[in-house]
Amino acid sequence: MSINIQEIIKEYQSKIGDTGSTNVQVALLTARIRHLTKHFKTHKKDHHSRRGLLHLVSQRKKLLTYLRGNNKTAYSKLISHLELRK
């Protein structure tokens, strides 16, 4: 996998050792989703992985809904930094 997990964690963690916060989880899911999206450019018939992609998108959506309800400033900052919505 061409995703460097440690770099993503360092960039989005709120304190040292923070690997499970909502921001980190959303950033990691976004990296995996983008990696799979590139994969589907060349492997159009890989339906098994497409199902996994849909699961990741659903999981990210749930986490973003949670974050929007609990911390709107962190939500808007994360959305703009990850370039998810316009």
Curated annotation (Swiss-Prot):
For this UniProt entry, the molecular function terms from Gene Ontology, in alphabetical order, are: rRNA binding; structural constituent of ribosome
Q: Supply the alphabetized keyword list.
A: Ribonucleoprotein, Ribosomal protein, RNA-binding, rRNA-binding
What does the record list as GO biological process?
translation
Pfam families, per the entry: Ribosomal_S15
Matches recorded under CDD domains: Ribosomal_S15p_S13e
What the entry lists under SUPFAM superfamilies is as follows: S15/NS1 RNA-binding domain
Keyword Amino-acid biosynthesis: yes or no? no
Q: What InterPro entries does this protein map onto?
A: Ribosomal_uS15, Ribosomal_uS15_bac-type, uS15_NS1_RNA-bd_sf
| The keyword Signal appears for this protein | no
Q: Name one GO cellular component term.
A: ribosome
Q: What does this protein do?
A: One of the primary rRNA binding proteins, it binds directly to 16S rRNA where it helps nucleate assembly of the platform of the 30S subunit by binding and bridging several RNA helices of the 16S rRNA. Forms an intersubunit bridge (bridge B4) with the 23S rRNA of the 50S subunit in the ribosome.
* Cited PANTHER family: RIBOSOMAL PROTEIN S15, BACTERIAL AND ORGANELLAR, SMALL RIBOSOMAL SUBUNIT PROTEIN US15M
UniProt record similarity statement: Belongs to the universal ribosomal protein uS15 family.
Record's subunit section:
Part of the 30S ribosomal subunit. Forms a bridge to the 50S subunit in the 70S ribosome, contacting the 23S rRNA.
Output this protein's name.
Small ribosomal subunit protein uS15
Which classification does the entry list for the species? Bacteria, Pseudomonadati, Pseudomonadota, Gammaproteobacteria, Candidatus Pseudothioglobaceae
Gene encoding the protein? rpsO
